[in-house]
């Protein structure tokens, strides 16, 4: 299944706020998670919608998300929390959390077009997994820095999560540590996502 490129507002009307996909939010009182045409939602549908929230927020294909679930399942610790850490530490998401892009798809474009360096080297793979002490910088060219400056100016100032530091004037972000669960930028019940996939096998 390919990455979603359709109407974004349609997704947030059904699934709720997805800040990685779009800065738009559903109208107050229209949260679709509290509604259902057929009355009470089935447990399957609840798990499916949590999985879809995760997929659309981080801009993943079904195959990519399944791969992350399998990696998380083999790691030590809670599968759900490890899954969120893997997704949050992606380079495209890290740029988004730093405020260098308004959405994750926008951050992915910056990476794909070679505007971003990690530890002094261009990294053009959005799924690159950031590690503690990684230094993320914008390429030292006018068009790259102008592009990112415009995005920084357009973004709504938000408190950075504890695992990141931003040096705006140097166009530089620092990864301090692996993200804590409480700093994840999406309201999600990751256990339902893990349950969804465990029941598919």
UniProtKB/Swiss-Prot annotation:
SMART domains: Ribosomal_S4 (SM01390), S4 (SM00363). Transmembrane segments: none annotated. Keywords: Chloroplast, Plastid, Ribonucleoprotein, Ribosomal protein, RNA-binding, rRNA-binding. One of its GO terms (cellular component) is small ribosomal subunit. Residues 89-152 form the S4 RNA-binding domain. CDD domains: S4 (cd00165). The keyword Ribosomal protein applies. It is found in: Plastid, Chloroplast. Residues 1-14 have a biased composition (Basic residues). Residues 1-44 are annotated as: Disordered. Its main location: plastid. GO terms for molecular function: rRNA binding; structural constituent of ribosome. One of its GO terms (biological process) is translation. It comes from the Eukaryota. It holds the Pfam family Ribosomal_S4. PANTHER family: 30S 40S RIBOSOMAL PROTEIN, SMALL RIBOSOMAL SUBUNIT PROTEIN US4M. NCBIfam families: PRK05327.1, rpsD_bact. Part of the 30S ribosomal subunit. Contacts protein S5. The interaction surface between S4 and S5 is involved in control of translational fidelity. One of the primary rRNA binding proteins, it binds directly to 16S rRNA where it nucleates assembly of the body of the 30S subunit. With S5 and S12 plays an important role in translational accuracy. Belongs to the universal ribosomal protein uS4 family. This is Small ribosomal subunit protein uS4c. It comes from Draba nemorosa (Woodland whitlowgrass).
């Amino acid at each position: 299944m390919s990455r979603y490129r359709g109407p974004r507002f349609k997704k947030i009307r059904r699934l709720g706020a997805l800040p990685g996909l779009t800065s738009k939010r559903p109208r107050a009182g229209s949260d679709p998670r509290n509604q259902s045409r057929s009355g009470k939602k089935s447990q399957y549908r609840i798990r499916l919608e949590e999985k879809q929230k995760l997929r659309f927020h981080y801009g993943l294909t079904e195959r990519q998300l399944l791969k992350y679930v399998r990696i998380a399942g083999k790691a030590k610790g809670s599968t759900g929390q490890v899954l969120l850490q893997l997704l949050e530490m992606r380079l495209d998401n890290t740029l988004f959390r730093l405020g260098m892009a308004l959405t994750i798809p926008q951050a992915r474009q910056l990476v794909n077009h070679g505007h971003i360096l990690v530890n002094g080297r261009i990294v053009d793979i959005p799924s690159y997994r950031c590690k503690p002490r990684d230094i993320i910088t914008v390429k030292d060219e006018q068009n790259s820095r102008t592009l990112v400056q415009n995005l920084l100016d357009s973004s709504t100032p938000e408190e950075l999560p504890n695992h990141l530091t931003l040096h705006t004037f140097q166009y530089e972000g620092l990864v301090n540590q692996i993200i804590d669960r409480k700093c994840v930028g999406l309201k999600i019940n990751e256990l339902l996502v893990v349950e969804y996939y465990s029941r598919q096998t």
